[in-house]
Every structure is written in structure tokens, then in C-alpha cells.
Amino acid sequence: MAIRWADGTDSDMIAMDDTYFPVIVATWVGAPTEKSVRAYFQWLHEMLARAKRDSTLFINITDASLAKTPAPDVRRLIAELTTTLENAGADKNAVSAYVVVDNPLIRGVLTALGWLHGSMNVTHVATCKEALDLGLRQLGRARKPAPQGLDPAKWRRPERARRAS
């Protein structure tokens, strides 16, 4: 497919990129809203269905380095939708999840969500390159081919997300 955008308001967006499936990258910009979070989780369910259909595993990378802390109701929604995704089998089809985060507040939110969801295999990293490198290694260990054309050193955020930051 390619890049899909979830826009909540003028100040938040999520770029959802499956160009290199089974490696998927979501770039969060601003404070997520209910609308953008629901669109993101709908996309994750689609990626899970695709992985099941293709009998493969996927690497889920979330670039939260441009994100702002979500409101409490949005954090609750993220927790609820994460549970729904786990119940749909994400823990069996996602090799690993990597979150690029440098904001201590965002890291705290993610850590709290991790405590609520013990089955989540989430690794926090400093850069997208690091997440992509680790993800490709994980695919290799799972004996799954790396997506053609994905070079972690050359990967860039979508232009619209770069402009918004």
C-alpha cells in the first residue's frame, strides 16, 4: 500500500506506513486525539489480518519522538484498544514492537501501558534507524525475509510529518 494519514485535529496526525510490510512504521505528531488513535488501531488490525492471511510475522515500529502527551481519556482509549489488538492475536503475529521515544513523559505513559499489558513485547529505542535495524534482525532470527528496498540508514519520516514538527 503506502502511507495513510490519520488526522485528529490541526495539531495531531499519525503517518501509518506499510510500504515495507512486514515492517510497519507509524509516526505520531502532536497530542493524539480519539479520532487519530481509533484510525491507528484500525490500521493495526488491518496489518494483523494481512500478517495472518500471508502467514507471516510483522515488526511494529512507533515513532513517538514528535508526539506530545495524550489526554487521560485518550490514554484510557489506547489501553482499551491495545487489549482489543492483543485479543485479536497481535502477540502471536508481531515479532516485536519498537517505540522511538525521547520525551520522558511519553516514555512514562508507554511504560504504564506496558505494565497493564504484560504480553506486549515493546522495546524503547532512541532513533528510527535503531528500531529498523533491530526489527530487521528480529525478522532474520524468525527466518523471515527482510522487505526489499528497506535501508534503515536511508529511511526518512514522511515529508508531511517532518514539516509539521
Language model: regions and residue ranges:
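Amphipathic, Lys/Arg-enriched alpha-helical "gate/interface" segment within cytosolic domains
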Residues: 1-165
